[in-house]
């Protein structure tokens, strides 16, 4: 029995970060009812219905196929909303309102409902109507700048940093927090999760390190960049790679020793001074 046992969730089928949020809620014990399309989404990069390897986002969910442009099917969703604790949607801004499933309509049916919505840029603002993908959110927030080696173009990251780290996880945290509020007050809330905002939030560690003078604008010129030999990847004799991140002085000394170098070699003096500064901070 998970911590969300007894919580009922209605999820309007979408792409990537939104289904992942529903999956996490289901993993923690919530009953998730997925409202699927009666016909495949022509704009989806992956057909989750025919691609079994991609259907893991449906794990632990029940499902029903409805046409959200059909008033009778919209009413079916609203009936489910009346009996549920959470609704999740990842449509473009204004779409659920046009369908008759916006927050105001849903809260009229169920004032305690937690209405979770996911977009790339937020519901309002100059970029709200724009399309976007993970790399766009990671780029515009500045997070992509710190990946890669000096003089190289920024490295595209896996579709995790923005979509999942900046989108899915903030949405789930917002939903679970709002559930607690609804239980205590009887009032639901709207969780407006924007992947761009969540990605900026997740950069808090980087900005903190930069404020301490340990993160420079130049890629690979800091303690944590891929350009430093104590934080990098190396190809081994078998062709595979090993990752190394020996930031703290004790780990760095162990790395030097295991590599067969002399710890007291004069060539390490500057590095030892830099590590001593890091330790003092």
Language model segments and positions:
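N-terminal helix-loop segment corresponding to the beta1-alpha1 unit
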Residues: 1-187
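Acidic, glycine-rich segments within the central catalytic cores of soluble metabolic enzymes
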Residues: 140-281
């Amino acid at each position: 029995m998970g911590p969300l046992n007894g919580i009922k969730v209605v999820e309007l089928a979408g792409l990537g970060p939104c289904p992942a949020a529903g999956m996490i809620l289901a993993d923690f014990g919530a009953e998730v009812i997925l409202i699927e399309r009666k016909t495949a989404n022509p704009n989806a990069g992956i057909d989750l219905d025919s691609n079994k390897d991609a259907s893991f986002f449906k794990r632990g969910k029940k499902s029903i196929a409805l046409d959200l442009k059909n008033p009778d099917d919209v009413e079916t969703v609203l009936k489910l909303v009346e009996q549920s604790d959470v609704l999740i949607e990842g449509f473009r801004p204004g779409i659920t309102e046009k369908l008759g499933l916006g927050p105001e309509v849903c809260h009229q049916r169920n004032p305690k409902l937690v209405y979770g919505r996911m977009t790339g840029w937020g519901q309002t603002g100059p970029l709200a109507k724009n399309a976007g993908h993970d790399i766009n959110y990671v780029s515009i927030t500045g997070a992509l700048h710190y990946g890669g080696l000096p003089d190289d173009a920024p490295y595209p990251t896996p579709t995790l940093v923005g979509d999942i780290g900046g989108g899915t996880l903030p949405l789930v945290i917002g939903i679970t927090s709002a559930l607690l509020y609804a239980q205590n007050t009887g009032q639901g809330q709207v969780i407006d999760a924007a992947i761009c905002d969540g990605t900026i939030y997740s950069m808090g560690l980087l900005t903190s390190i930069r404020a301490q003078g340990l993160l420079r604008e130049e890629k690979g010129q800091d303690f944590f960049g891929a350009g430093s030999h104590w934080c990098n990847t190396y190809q081994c004799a078998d062709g595979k790679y090993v990752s190394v991140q020996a930031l703290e002085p004790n780990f760095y000394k162990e790395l030097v020793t295991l590599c067969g170098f002399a710890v007291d070699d004069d060539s390490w003096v500057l590095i030892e001074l830099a590590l001593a500064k890091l330790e003092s901070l």
